[in-house]
Amino acid sequence: MKKRHQRLFLVLGVVAGVSVATALVLNAFRDNMTFFITPSEVMAKSDMPERHFRIGGLVEDGSVERDSDSTQVRFRVTDTEASVPVDFEGILPDLFREGQGVVVEGRITSNGVFKADNVMARHDEDYMPAEAQEALDRVEHSVDEVGDY
């Protein structure tokens, strides 16, 4: 075999190896990625996969129910268009309260309740996830359009 052919096979082998390695790395990232979506997006998807993901929004006013015998807490996360019931077992952050920006991480159960493994409250009371802010802006915009009639 000529040196030229050997070099060609070497280059092709390196390109194939790099391609396979890149595909494996991207696949690993995709499998470990935690998605951040709004309650409206959760409600729009009828069959949420059994994947671990995050929901961002506000703790709905009047929705927090604490179990007096345990650390079990139930509340709803809303973006004002839709809300998702959340079930959490554990200690909530000190800044957790109704009307506060929150991000919950976990899985949606077959009965539509989000089983949270982690609850993160935002330090700044003016904080709102970007997706939730966009949803609020859409609602305000649609209300303005309806009011123009």
Swiss-Prot record:
Transmembrane intervals: 8-28
UniProt organism field: Halorhodospira halophila (strain DSM 244 / SL1) (Ectothiorhodospira halophila (strain DSM 244 / SL1))
Record-given protein name: Cytochrome c-type biogenesis protein CcmE
Periplasmic topological segments: 29-149
Gene responsible for this protein: ccmE
Pfam families: CcmE
InterPro entries linked: CcmE, CcmE-like_sf, NA-bd_OB-fold
Keyword Transmembrane helix part of the UniProt annotation: yes
Family: Belongs to the CcmE/CycJ family.
